[in-house]
C-alpha cells in the first residue's frame, strides 16, 4: 500500500434520464461484465414498474430507499494487545450510499420474483417504506455497533 498520497476519486457523470450522480453510481453497481446498457435498462424498467404498480414518483422512492438504508455506524476490526475488537465507527456519506446500494442490490437479487426488474422494483419500494431485507441489514449493522459501544475508545480514526 502506497504511503505517498490517496488515490484520486473518479468523476462519475450523472445519468441521462434523472441527471443524478447517486443513480449513476447505483447503475454502475448493478452492471455486470461492463454491460452498462443492460444495467440502465434494468433500473429504468424497475422505475417504470414502481410508477405503474404503486403510483409514486420512482426517483423519489429511490432517494428515500437509499436514505433509509444508508447506515450511520458500522464496526471495524481493530487489533489491540493481541486481541481483535469490533469498534463502532461513523460511516461517511459516500461509503454510506455505497453500502446502501450494495445491500439493496443483494437483497433484490435474493428475492423470489423471476426477473431482476421485478426484484429491484419491489426491494426499492419496500426500502423506501422502511421495510425489507436491506433495512434489516442496516438495523443489524446498527445493533452490532450499539452492542460494541464499550470498545469505542479503541477507535482507529477520530469520531466525527
Curated annotation (Swiss-Prot):
The keyword Repeat does not apply. The keyword tRNA-binding applies. One of its GO terms (molecular function) is rRNA binding. It comes from the Bacteria. InterPro entries: Ribosomal_uS7 (IPR000235), Ribosomal_uS7_bac/org-type (IPR005717), Ribosomal_uS7_CS (IPR020606), Ribosomal_uS7_dom (IPR023798), Ribosomal_uS7_dom_sf (IPR036823). One of its GO terms (biological process) is translation. Keywords: Ribonucleoprotein, Ribosomal protein, RNA-binding, rRNA-binding, tRNA-binding. GO terms for cellular component: small ribosomal subunit. NCBIfam families: rpsG_bact (TIGR01029). Belongs to the universal ribosomal protein uS7 family. Part of the 30S ribosomal subunit. Contacts proteins S9 and S11. One of the primary rRNA binding proteins, it binds directly to 16S rRNA where it nucleates assembly of the head domain of the 30S subunit. Is located at the subunit interface close to the decoding center, probably blocks exit of the E-site tRNA. HAMAP family: Ribosomal_uS7_B (MF_00480_B). This is Small ribosomal subunit protein uS7. It comes from Rickettsia rickettsii (strain Sheila Smith). The lineage of its organism: Bacteria, Pseudomonadati, Pseudomonadota, Alphaproteobacteria, Rickettsiales.
Amino acid at each position: 500500500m502506497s504511503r505517498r498520497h490517496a488515490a484520486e476519486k473518479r468523476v462519475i457523470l450523472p445519468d441521462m434520464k434523472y441527471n443524478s450522480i447517486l443513480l449513476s453510481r447505483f447503475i454502475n453497481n448493478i452492471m455486470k461484465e461492463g454491460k452498462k446498457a443492460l444495467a440502465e435498462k434494468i433500473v429504468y424498467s424497475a422505475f417504470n414498474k414502481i410508477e405503474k404498480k404503486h403510483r409514486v414518483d420512482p426517483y423519489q422512492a429511490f432517494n428515500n430507499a437509499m436514505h433509509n438504508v444508508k447506515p450511520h455506524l458500522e464496526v471495524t476490526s481493530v487489533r489491540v494487545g493481541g486481541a481483535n475488537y469490533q469498534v463502532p465507527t461513523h460511516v461517511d456519506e459516500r461509503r454510506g450510499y455505497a453500502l446502501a446500494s450494495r445491500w439493496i442490490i443483494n437483497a433484490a437479487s435474493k428475492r423470489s420474483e423471476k426477473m431482476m426488474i421485478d426484484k429491484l422494483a419491489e426491494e426499492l419500494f419496500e426500502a423506501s417504506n422502511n421495510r425489507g431485507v436491506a433495512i434489516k441489514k442496516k438495523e443489524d449493522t446498527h445493533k452490532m455497533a450499539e452492542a460494541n459501544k464499550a470498545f469505542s475508545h479503541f477507535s482507529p480514526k477520530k469520531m466525527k
